[in-house]
């Protein structure tokens, strides 16, 4: 069982087979699979606890409805792992509160019908035969809260959401990798063989393998080893409403594909987000500021295809609204970077474009299979060098 070790509870080990930088969900999953593969693995995290940056502001959703074939396959594998998570981490009865109430994508544009058909055809071809293409009448019959403006919908009952911190701690407890908090990486040392050591404010760890799982800060950490990663970060905000009264508790995650706005029930509350098209890429941020104009804007956009949100907006009180913000980290084709860098022994697991929760299980399994040689480098679709060589993957259309 992995432990979380703060500076007052113990010193850093002097060596490890693998050092993972970052203890968000991607770092925790990377360490879990590495330790399960028999590699002596430790995680270093500069904050006081695991999961305090992007993971802490996650919408906690999981889905296998994507447009890019490699993403579809990865997210399908992840969701399968999450459905049997207690068995995966070997913690009998461990509960991540997986709610499979589905994902419903909607459009009011009749001309988007062929695009929806194309995406569903691709998903069916890759084995997701349960994904449904719904005409307007069927959408309204099954989801009566949807406006008559809707033209077509896509639905997958298997998608849903979970408790991300339970998932994070499940990976930590189920693995054999300790997490050293308040540990800042200041250098990655190299020799003629590649990675040699990780230098931190708490000491130096000798290692021949380093995994960068630092979310928005991944490019900055890679630069310590002289590696350029073309990572971009943009702000994304979410609103949680403590009281709403009219949001159907059995509703799926609903996505307005025209605007990018989404919402879902959240126990007795609700969560809304998306639709931010104008934010420009920025440097990675420890604290991402919020905009108090955002709740009104997102509620207005949500009401476009789900009119009940207009009544919620009319009588909402300030103390019922909670805003948080994080950063989506992505590269040009909106697909993750998983695998080795030009420096031998230096690996990266990042750029999930705000969807690290759902990508972390399968993406981290792939990463460790690349480290151990179970998967050949040439069989990895998410390699960093695809970006430099211009061999980008088909751009992922379904980022929200």
Model region roles, listed by residue range:
Residues 1-18, 36-37, 397:
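Extreme N-terminal leader/targeting segments of oxidoreductases
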Residues 51, 204-250:
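Central helical "cap/lid" subdomain
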Residues 243-344:
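Active-site lid/adjacent beta-loop-alpha segment flanking the redox-cofactor pocket in flavoenzymes
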Residues 304-400:
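C-terminal catalytic lobe of FAD-dependent flavoproteins
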Residues 36-55:
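Glycine-rich FAD pyrophosphate-binding loop
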Residues 59-142, 260-262:
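Dinucleotide-binding Rossmann-like beta1-alpha1 core, especially the glycine-rich loop
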Residues 155-208:
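Helical element adjacent to the flavin cofactor pocket in flavoenzyme catalytic cores
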Residues 16-42:
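N-terminal Rossmann-like FAD-binding beta1-loop-alpha1 element of flavoenzymes
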């Amino acid at each position: 069982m992995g432990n979380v070790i703060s500076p007052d509870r113990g010193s850093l080990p002097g060596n490890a087979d693998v050092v993972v930088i970052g203890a968000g969900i991607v770092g925790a999953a990377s360490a879990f699979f590495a330790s399960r593969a028999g590699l002596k693995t430790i995680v270093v995290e500069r904050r006081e606890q695991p999961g305090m940056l992007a993971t802490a502001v996650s919408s906690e959703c999981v889905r296998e409805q994507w447009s890019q074939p490699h993403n579809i396959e990865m997210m399908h594998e992840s969701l399968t792992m999450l459905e049997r998570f207690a068995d995966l981490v070997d913690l009998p009865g461990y509960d991540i509160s997986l709610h499979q109430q589905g994902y419903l994508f909607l459009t009011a544009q009749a001309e988007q019908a062929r695009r929806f058909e194309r995406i569903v055809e691709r998903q069916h071809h890759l084995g997701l035969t349960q994904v449904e293409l719904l005409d307007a009448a069927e959408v309204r019959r099954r989801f009566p809260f949807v406006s008559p403006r809707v033209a077509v919908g896509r639905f997958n009952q298997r998608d849903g959401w979970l408790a991300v911190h339970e998932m994070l701690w499940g990976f930590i407890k189920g693995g054999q990798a300790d997490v050293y908090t308040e540990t800042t990486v200041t250098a990655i040392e190299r020799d003629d063989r590649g990675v040699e050591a990780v230098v931190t404010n708490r000491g130096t760890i000798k290692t021949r393998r380093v995994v960068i799982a630092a979310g928005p800060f991944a490019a900055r950490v890679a630069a310590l080893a002289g590696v350029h990663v073309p990572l971009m970060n943009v702000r994304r905000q979410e609103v949680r409403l403590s009281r709403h009264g009219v949001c159907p508790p059995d509703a799926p995650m609903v996505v307005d594909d025209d605007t990018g706005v989404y919402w879902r029930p959240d126990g007795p509350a609700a969560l809304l987000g998306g639709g931010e098209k104008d934010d420009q890429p920025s440097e990675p941020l420890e604290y991402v500021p919020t905009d108090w104009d955002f709740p009104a804007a997102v509620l207005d956009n949500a009401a476009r295809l789900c009119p009940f949100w207009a009544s919620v907006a009319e009588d909402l009180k300030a103390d019922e609204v909670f805003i948080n913000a994080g950063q989506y980290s992505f590269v040009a084709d909106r697909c993750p970077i998983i695998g080795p860098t030009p420096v031998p022994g230096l690996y990266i697991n990042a750029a999930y474009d705000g969807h690290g929760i759902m990508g972390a299980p399968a993406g981290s399994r792939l990463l460790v299979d690349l480290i151990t040689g179970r998967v050949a480098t040439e069989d990895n679709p998410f390699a960093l060098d695809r970006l430099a060589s211009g061999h980008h993957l088909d751009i992922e259309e379904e980022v929200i």
